[in-house]
Structure formats: structure tokens, C-alpha cells
């Protein structure tokens, strides 16, 4: 059996890990073991935060809709409920975009929501 020297492959593997860790601070960008640990953690954080980003954007959309609807004298939950009762199927992303870019269209949706409020909402 021929002897296998692994120097080339080992150096290539280490170089790839160090290249991935090139922007990190201190030992995490220079030492192989620290760089390997950090790149594994970084991949975990990336995976987690790609999923958290979806909820973050939904929260941002809700804040924008709430601010715009309160400017028209209506709370967010009453606005969404009024749209649901009216059968308007516009998602929060589109509502937030309307609130930012086309306030007249958003105001017309607020009027639709006000017209479709339950009569005993205060009781």
C-alpha cells in the first residue's frame, strides 16, 4: 500500500476555513481552531436569523400600518378587522407599502374599514 501524504489536502481545508473567517476579529481570523469554531457558530446564527427576519419584517409592517391608521383616527386592530369584514384581501406587506408611498389609497382603505366596523364595538 502506498503512503498517502495529506499535507496538500489539510492545507487546502485550513485555508478555506480561514478564508471564510477573513472578516472576524482577533484570533478568530488567524487561528484555525478558533476560526473553525466561529464559522460553525456563524452558520448557526445565519440560519436562525434568516427565519427571524421574516417576523422582524412583519413587525415593521404592522408598526407602519398602525402609525398610518392612527393618523386617520383608527387603531391597527380595528383597521384590520374592518378590512376583514369588508372582504378586502390585502396583506400587511402591501398595506405598509401603501401607507408609506400612496397615502390616498391607504386612506380610502381606512374609510372602507370604518364603514365595516361592528356597531357594538364599544360595548
UniProtKB/Swiss-Prot annotation:
Keywords: Ribonucleoprotein, Ribosomal protein, RNA-binding, rRNA-binding
CDD domains: Ribosomal_L20
Annotated Pfam families: Ribosomal_L20
GO cellular component terms, A-Z: ribonucleoprotein complex; ribosome
Coiled-coil annotated spans: none
InterPro entries cross-referenced by the UniProt entry: Ribosomal_bL20, RIBOSOMAL_L20_CS, Ribosomal_protein_bL20_C
Domain of life of the organism encoding this protein: Bacteria
PROSITE patterns for the chain: RIBOSOMAL_L20
GO molecular function, one term: rRNA binding
Residues making up the signal peptide according to the UniProt record: none
Ribosomal protein in keyword set: yes
Gene3D superfamilies: 6.10.160.10, Ribosomal protein L20
Record flagged with keyword Flavoprotein: no
Biological process according to GO: ribosomal large subunit assembly; translation
Annotated stretches, region: Disordered: 1-23
Biased composition (Basic residues): 1-15
Function of the protein: Binds directly to 23S ribosomal RNA and is necessary for the in vitro assembly process of the 50S ribosomal subunit. It is not involved in the protein synthesizing functions of that subunit.
PANTHER family the UniProt entry points to: 39S RIBOSOMAL PROTEIN L20
Family: Belongs to the bacterial ribosomal protein bL20 family.
Stated name of the protein: Large ribosomal subunit protein bL20
Organism: Cutibacterium acnes (strain DSM 16379 / KPA171202) (Propionibacterium acnes)
Taxonomic path: Bacteria, Bacillati, Actinomycetota, Actinomycetes, Propionibacteriales
